[in-house]
């Protein structure tokens, strides 16, 4: 899950993030975080090798040592885009975002600040925030098992059913579109809905085409990535 922490400077945002990360890691969650500053700052330094790479035209520039790897991109990137990249690449259970004003993720307000869209908690105690995050992670994990069709055949949308399952009021088998075939389709890093029929067609078609290829074996996880097609150049018209 993704959650944002926002508030004025010196309101205690970073301290809360520290405490939340420690509490979640202690409970076995994999946690990643993003820190945003409204100031025009850079961690790169003029004259350093990475700076020289950038001035020569390289962007982004990656610095790698025996203890860390840092990517420096000399342009602003939205919170949603950074979050999408981190969730796709590192797959944390929880991604904590400190400081961004925008973003489609749920947010926690700290201090005396005007509530932003998507605010779910205001000045919560650490224990209450941890419980909220734990519950949302559990709901997200159940949602990953549901087809995401929001067909309403169970009497709820998929998120509502997931929350009812986490609360112990419903069970996974209550989903009328649940398939034994686990097909997950992501477009731009976001999952799109696929019911029994679509899942069955995709699974049968892909595995059928791959069955004759060397390296394929029944029961193995198959991942296919479709890159955007480059637009074809229009043929030049010669005039007589």
What spans do the regions from the language model cover?
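Walker A (P-loop) phosphate-binding motif
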Residues: 1-39, 146-149
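Non-heme iron-sulfur electron-transfer modules
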Residues: 165-180
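Ser/Thr/Gly-rich flexible loops in soluble cytosolic domains mediating phosphotransfer, phosphorylation
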Residues: 113-145
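N-terminal phosphate/diphosphate-binding loop that engages ATP/GTP or pyrophosphate donors
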Residues: 21-74
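Local cysteine-cluster metal-coordination motifs and their immediate loop/turn environment
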Residues: 147-163, 176-177
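Glycine-rich phosphate-binding loop used to anchor ATP phosphates in small-molecule kinases
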Residues: 70-111
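Short, hydrophobic/π-rich interface segment
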Residues: 188-212
């Amino acid at each position: 899950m993704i959650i944002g922490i926002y508030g004025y400077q010196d309101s205690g945002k970073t301290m809360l993030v520290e405490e939340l990360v420690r509490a979640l890691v202690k409970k076995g969650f994999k946690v990643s975080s993003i820190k945003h500053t409204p100031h025009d700052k850079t961690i790169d330094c003029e004259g350093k090798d990475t700076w020289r790479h950038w001035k020569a035209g390289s962007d982004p520039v990656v610095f790698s040592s025996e203890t860390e790897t840092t990517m420096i991109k000399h342009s602003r990137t939205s919170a949603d885009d950074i979050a999408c990249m981190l969730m796709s690449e590192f797959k944390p259970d929880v991604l904590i975002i400190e400081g961004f004003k925008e973003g489609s993720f749920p947010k926690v307000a700290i201090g005396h600040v005007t509530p932003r869209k998507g605010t779910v908690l205001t000045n919560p105690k650490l224990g209450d925030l941890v419980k909220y995050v734990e519950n949302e992670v559990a709901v997200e994990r159940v949602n990953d098992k549901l087809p995401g069709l929001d067909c309403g055949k169970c009497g709820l949308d998929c998120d509502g059913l997931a929350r009812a399952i986490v609360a112990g009021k419903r069970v996974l088998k209550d989903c009328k579109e649940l398939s034994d075939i686990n097909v997950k389709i992501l477009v731009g890093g976001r999952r799109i809905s696929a019911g029994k029929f679509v899942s069955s067609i995709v699974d049968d078609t892909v595995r059928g085409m791959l069955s004759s290829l060397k390296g394929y074996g029944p029961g193995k996880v198959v991942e296919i990535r479709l890159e955007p097609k480059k637009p074809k150049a229009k043929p030049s018209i010669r005039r007589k």
